[in-house]
């Protein structure tokens, strides 16, 4: 990940020793599986900072978050700034029309908050609509009828309104400038756009914005997106209403309905992010938190339960084995298969289906799965997936001890493949 940090007047947990925290570094733990236990040839250096950290998959985004911290903003402001830059430079994975989930830790309250900003389905999305009107047996993966109401902008707004010190005016500035002036397309994004050429060619505006004569731009090309810059500038002036009730909403509805979609102004205007209670498990003394459904985080917690409960049953000591031992990876993979099987079987929208999170995260349930792990052979995965993906992760921490952990996604590479013209 691209990381950056700053030097300024410090407060713990990243600062100099104080009466309240005589050894702040005592909270920094080198986990088994780090460079000290097997990754001796890892090329990237750790980032160690006293006053705040921004970690993203893109150096420009990390720099944007850093700028906000230098200006006196907090971790929430920095997360929105970094995320908005990724909405420009990483549209293979994310964008202003994506969804967002965030965990926000407020140090002054010693409390963790969870934000679900996954957009809901248009009101007319029913099984009958897809089966009878479109002749489909499932929701498509491309085109306007693959896209739900965008949740990301509402999520940014909710975070800033509740915990931030800035607004879109400040936090979107770097993103808007990058969209106007351009950025370099590196290897990862070039690979993704090459793989998505056919998807993008199916949409005239996507082809115009992302391709050159129907082909992916050359590696290391400088990319600009002035229309996206205009949208960001509009939101700097008018806030979230520009997206959900104003000119951007008009453009979304016009595009979707012109191509047989059923998203309406009401679908957009009525959407609100939701603050929810985080879920958690305890793994060897550490409390680990995730978003509840419809987020997929309970699978990670279930996997940790399986590792903790089942490893001793099989005589496996993961810490002692370390990441250079095949049994370490075998056990990890088998635990993940079991957790992902339950994810696919049970996860859904809790407004419409009961997801038995409490039962799935009970350690007695994890114990019931132990005999399904065979240390001598791999099990058959219950779900087979492709290599496609479209998600970013970022995290921020500030001098006051506030922290944000955020996922922002368009589900697959370049999402539905449909872009909205101005």
Regions found by a protein language model. Name each.
Residues 10-63, 67, 75-238, 243-245, ...:
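Noncatalytic scaffold domains of N-terminal-nucleophile
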């Amino acid at each position: 990940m691209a990381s950056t940090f700053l030097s300024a007047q410090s407060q713990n947990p990243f600062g100099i020793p104080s009466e309240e925290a005589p050894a702040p570094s005592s909270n920094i733990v080198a986990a088994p599986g780090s460079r000290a236990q097997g990754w001796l040839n890892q090329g990237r250096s750790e980032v160690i900072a006293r006053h705040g950290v921004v970690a993203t998959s893109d150096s420009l985004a990390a720099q944007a978050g850093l700028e906000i911290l230098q200006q006196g903003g907090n971790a929430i402001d920095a997360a929105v700034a970094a995320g908005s830059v990724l909405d420009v430079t990483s549209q293979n994975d994310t964008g202003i029309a994506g969804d967002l989930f965030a965990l926000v830790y407020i140090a002054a309250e010693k409390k963790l908050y969870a934000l679900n900003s996954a957009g809901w389905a248009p009101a007319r999305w029913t099984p009958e609509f897809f089966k009878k009107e479109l002749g489909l047996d499932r929701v498509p993966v491309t085109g306007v009828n693959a896209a739900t109401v965008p949740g990301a902008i509402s999520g940014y707004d909710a975070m800033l309104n509740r915990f931030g010190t800035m607004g879109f005016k400040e936090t979107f500035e770097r993103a808007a400038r990058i969209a106007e002036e351009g950025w370099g397309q590196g290897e990862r994004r070039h690979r993704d756009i090459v793989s998505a050429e056919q998807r993008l060619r199916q949409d005239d505006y996507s082809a115009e914005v992302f391709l050159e004569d129907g082909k992916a731009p050359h590696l290391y090309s400088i990319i600009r997106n002035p229309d996206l810059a205009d949208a960001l500038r509009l939101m700097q002036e008018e806030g979230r209403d520009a997206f959900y009730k104003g000119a951007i909403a008009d453009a979304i509805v016009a595009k979707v309905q012109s191509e047989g979609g059923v998203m309406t102004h009401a679908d957009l205007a009525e959407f609100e992010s939701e603050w929810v209670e985080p879920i958690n498990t305890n793994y060897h003394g550490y409390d680990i938190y995730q978003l509840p459904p419809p987020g997929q985080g309970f699978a990670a917690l279930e996997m940790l339960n399986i590792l903790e409960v089942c490893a001793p049953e099989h005589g496996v000591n993961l810490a002692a084995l370390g990441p250079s031992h095949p049994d370490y990876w075998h056990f990890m993979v088998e635990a993940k298969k079991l957790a992902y099987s339950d994810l696919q079987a049970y996860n859904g929208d809790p407004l419409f289906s009961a997801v038995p999170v409490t039962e799935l995260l009970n350690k007695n349930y994890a114990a019931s799965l132990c005999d399904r792990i065979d240390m001598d052979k791999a099990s058959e995965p219950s779900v087979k997936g492709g290599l496609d993906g479209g998600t970013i992760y970022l995290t921020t921490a500030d001098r006051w001890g506030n922290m944000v952990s955020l996922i922002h996604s368009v589900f697959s590479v370049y999402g539905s493949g449909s872009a909205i013209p101005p």
